[in-house]
Amino acid sequence: MKAELIAVGTEILTGQIINTNAQFLSEKCAELGIDVYFHTAVGDNEGRLLSTLEVASKRSNMVVLCGGLGPTEDDLTKQTLATFLGRNLVFDELAMAKLDRFFASRPGRVRTPNNERQAQIVEGSQALQNPAGLAVGGMIEQDGVTYIVLPGPPSELKAMFSESLLPLLSQSQQQLYSRVLRFFGIGESQLVTVLADVIDKQTDPTLAPYAKVGEVTLRLSTKATSQEEANLRLNQLEEDILQHDKLADYFYAYGEDNSLVKTVATRLAEKRQTIAIVEQGTGGLLQAELSLALADQPYFSGGKVVGQLGIESGWLSEEADCIRQELQADLGLAVSVLIKPESTEDNVLAKVYLTLATPSGISQKEIDLGGYSWQYLRQLACLQAWDFVRNTL
């Protein structure tokens, strides 16, 4: 199904408010398997809204109008849609009863005739009740196009969508199921190049790459009527992806909200191992990230932060083992970021030294990083450290 979102309101065109409804509705439509092809904004003008509806009705199967349902003269959405469809406006009994209760409980407020407009719907519509306000919405199908009318205030729109509209859309629509693969150690452009043949021929399922700080994610999506049906398609696509040019070597986890440090935290908890950390050049960022990822789990024994001149690469093995024994941890991680003298403010060059001490021995790794700001380079150094620990666990 092809959908179009029409935001009605001059305040959107003049930049007085941001159209956050479009982002919310697009995301929810995607979850339902509804393809949103167009976002449109139009002012509070009947003629221009009629022209917009004329265009939308010819290129979309679903037209969602947001805003313009209030009691004032410039709230024209329902009236204009009724004119476009050649129908009348009628009162919805439930919405009118809610309006009655609202004013009955507020005797000091004057009920003017224009308030009644909020309880009107296009004749033949299925009313969409408003849990967070007074203006009723509606849904109607005519000539193969479904028209949906929603309020403009985001709190009302979200409540109406979730409680009134979503159950109706879910009855007949396939849903969009997604799976996120996370990769570290490969850039977005390289990943896209490796997967060019898969990307070029994609239909359903689809895949979309997203560059994050120091890593790349791939979102695999398919439309299906059940999770089981979706898994069959997503499993096949994932297998195809990971067989390309050793991409499995860069893949480390699933999930939109996952991360390298969360992966390390999970493995520490699974193995019931503790870790102590000494870091130089990262400002305590490693310890802060791990503490947050572990929450109240007792697998971070503690650590220390050493100043820029505190650790040189040759001392790391001793530092890692000392911190491990001092804090009685299973693992001791020592990280040192040494800035090279030729660095500039916007082009920091550094050597990152990583050492992990365990009861069975020492593992070490050196990485050259450069071409970034100092803040970004610190984040990358931490990612390298977590990937190093992950591969060692």
Curated annotation (Swiss-Prot):
> What SUPFAM superfamilies does the record tag this protein with?
CinA-like, Molybdenum cofactor biosynthesis proteins
Pfam families assigned:
CinA (PF02464), CinA_KH (PF18146), MoCF_biosynth (PF00994)
Q: Which InterPro entries match?
A: CinA, CinA-like_C, CinA_C, CinA_KH, Competence-induced_CinA, MoaB/Mog-like_dom_sf, MoaB/Mog_dom
Q: Which domain of life is it from?
A: Bacteria
Q: Which Gene3D superfamilies match?
A: 3.30.70.2860, CinA-like (3.90.950.20), MoaB/Mog-like domain (3.40.980.10)
Family (UniProt): Belongs to the CinA family.
Q: What HAMAP family would the database entry show?
A: CinA_B
Q: What is this protein called?
A: Putative competence-damage inducible protein
Species the sequence originates in: Streptococcus suis (strain 98HAH33)
